[in-house]
């Protein structure tokens, strides 16, 4: 059993992960701007403040905090918020851990499959592939670099590159469940995905096995925008149309952010499967059936 501190613990993944960790007998503390529960502690990036009680006898930190990539159009200011919310928060954690002379057993950080860049190709990306040259690649690269500084404190560091997280409430699926379901753009871009339970189980595995390095947390079954949408329509008993939402409409609606809807490649799960990680929901149909 371990004492675990989570940032972003009140979000979609953090809430589920906290529940699963506690069921295993771990003690979980959550950093939040507005603490309400006994296990929640205040932090404020704007003033570089963290309640030091949160670090008492801590073993692991799981860093999930970060402004939503797809919540708002990518203005210059919004891009800065997206990066700073991930990097500055990791820097503040590092400063506090060093200042308090804490011997961490591990630092686990979220990242995204956007590390490889938002592009559509026939290449299947593995963890050793180079970082993408676009904005998503920049975000993930800086995010991961901020996490890797914990290696200087002799703490094992792992980064979890995550695809679309499938959950019953909130997240991408909520926005995709439109009255009529269709693919986006030309429909041929791939959508790396993972069921929230599998994702949380991998975070737990990272702790229990003291994993180090980068890992693609994606399900092994590949889907394009069209095949994903068709499977979603069947699972939710909603009509599916073969006519995709045109790219130009998405670009008008979302600006540069539309790239995350219109581009995507396959991402390999082989590394985590080779570690013996077993997906509870390896196929999209079974994942959606459980959720709906």
Mark where each language-model region is:
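N-terminal Rossmann NAD(P)H-binding glycine-rich loop of SDR-like oxidoreductase domains
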Residues: 4-24
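NAD(P)H-binding glycine-rich loop region in Rossmannoid oxidoreductase-like domains
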Residues: 43-92
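Alpha-helical substrate-binding/gating segment
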Residues: 174-181, 189-223
């Amino acid at each position: 059993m371990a004492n675990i501190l989570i940032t972003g613990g009140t979000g979609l993944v953090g809430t589920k992960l906290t529940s699963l960790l506690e069921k295993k007998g771990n003690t979980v503390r959550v950093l939040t701007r507005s603490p309400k529960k006994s296990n929640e502690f205040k932090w404020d990036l704007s003033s570089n403040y963290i309640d030091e009680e949160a670090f008492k006898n801590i073993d692991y930190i799981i860093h999930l905090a970060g402004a939503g990539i797809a919540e708002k159009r990518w203005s210059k200011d919004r891009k800065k918020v997206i990066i700073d919310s991930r990097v500055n928060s990791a820097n503040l954690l590092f400063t506090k851990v060093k200042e308090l002379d804490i011997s961490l057993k591990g630092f686990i950080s979220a990242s995204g499959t956007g590390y490889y860049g938002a592009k559509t190709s026939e290449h299947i990306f593995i963890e050793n592939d180079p970082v993408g040259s676009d904005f998503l690649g920049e975000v993930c690269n800086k995010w991961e670099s901020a996490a890797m500084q914990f290696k200087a404190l002799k703490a094992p560091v792992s980064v979890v590159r995550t695809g679309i997280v499938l959950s019953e409430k909130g997240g991408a699926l909520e926005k995709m469940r439109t009255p009529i379901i269709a693919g986006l753009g030309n429909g041929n871009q791939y959508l790396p995905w993972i069921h929230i339970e599998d994702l949380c189980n991998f975070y737990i595995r990272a702790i229990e096995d003291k994993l180090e390095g980068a890992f693609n947390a994606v399900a092994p079954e590949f889907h394009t925008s069209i095949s994903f949408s068709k499977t979603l329509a069947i699972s939710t008993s909603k009509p599916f149309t073969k006519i995709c939402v045109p790219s130009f409409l998405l670009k008008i609606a979302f600006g540069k952010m539309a790239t995350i809807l219109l581009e995507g490649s396959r991402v390999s799960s082989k590394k985590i499967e080779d570690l013996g990680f077993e997906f509870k929901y390896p196929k999209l149909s079974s994942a959606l059936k459980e959720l709906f």
